[in-house]
Amino acid sequence: MNKKYTAEELDLLHAELYDILGETIRVCQKHNIPYFVIGGTAIGALYDQAVLPWDDDIDIGMTRENYNKFLKVAPEELGPSYFLSWIETDPHTPYYFAKVKKNDTLFVEEMFKNVPMHPGIFVDIFPFDKIPDNKLLRRIQSEALGFLKCCLMGKEIWMWKHFGTCEICLLYTSPSPRDGLLS
């Protein structure tokens, strides 16, 4: 969560998030793309059957194969009120994953307020690569990837500050010959 919201602001934000999620699910179901909720979204679904009252986003995950399929079909399948934001469609995005954003809405994260990218309210879509079956190995992989994420996000912010570009994202939005390094 980036800031404090009033209850009314959160209600409006949650309504938009559910709308975006519904459209994302529609596309996934039409194309037989399995997905799963993650992070705070999973906790909210488990305990409240809803978005956590204080949460300002929804996170879903897909295997890399399904993520790539989603990236291929979503630009044509999403309704006109939605936009698939990732490095191919929103070249200034500093993110290494995709977002389904709602047009004609505004949600700008403070650290990216000067980045010329689509400003809409969004649902995050994360690719999952080479997930180990072993619980300990999954934990190690998760910690390593969390560290890598922090390094990348810091690098991206620095790059925007100094160069106004984020070419490093290309390394992490498509399959890599290094896939499986941690498994």
Show the residue positions of the predicted features.
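Metal-dependent nucleotidyltransferase catalytic core
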Residues: 17-20, 61-101
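Single conserved hydrophobic/aromatic residue that forms the stacking wall/gate
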Residues: 172-182
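Active-site nucleotide-donor binding segment shared across nucleotidyl transfer reactions
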Residues: 25-58, 67
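Alpha-helical structural context detector biased toward long hydrophobic helices
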Residues: 136, 159-161, 165-171
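Helical scaffold of the NTase/Pol beta-like nucleotidyltransferase catalytic core
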Residues: 1-38
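Short, cationic low-complexity segments
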Residues: 145-159
